[in-house]
């Protein structure tokens, strides 16, 4: 598996993890929800990058995707095609 394939898989897992956690949360205001999602994303990024030098280098870039991920979840939480498009868009 090359770097691009590993990154694609990582981003898919990240979005799936965020989406499943989001569905378990109570849906309060958007600002509260976004703050919670930021913490979830931080945690998932840290878990995925702790033991991997390749992803450790990408950590800062992944953190920059957090706002995008929050917007994506709020607007397209149940749209599979948008999920796939988002994965393609943020994958190099």
Swiss-Prot record:
Keywords: Host cytoplasm, Host mitochondrion
Family of the protein in this entry: Belongs to the rotavirus A NSP6 family.
GO cellular component, one term: host cell mitochondrion
UniProt keyword annotation of Ribonucleoprotein present: no
Stated name of the protein: Non-structural protein 6
Cited Pfam families: Rota_NS6 (PF04866)
Self-association and partners: Interacts with NSP2 and NSP5.
Location of the protein in the cell: Host cytoplasm; Host mitochondrion
InterPro entries (alphabetical): Rotavirus_NSP6 (IPR006950)
């Amino acid at each position: 598996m090359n770097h691009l394939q590993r990154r694609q898989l990582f981003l898919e897992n990240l979005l799936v993890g965020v989406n499943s956690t989001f569905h378990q949360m109570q849906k309060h205001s958007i600002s509260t929800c976004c703050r919670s999602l930021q913490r979830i994303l931080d945690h998932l990024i840290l878990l995925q990058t702790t033991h991997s030098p390749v992803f450790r280098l990408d950590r800062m870039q992944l953190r920059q995707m957090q706002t995008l991920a929050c917007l994506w979840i709020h607007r397209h939480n149940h749209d599979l095609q948008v999920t796939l498009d988002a994965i393609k868009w943020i994958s190099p």
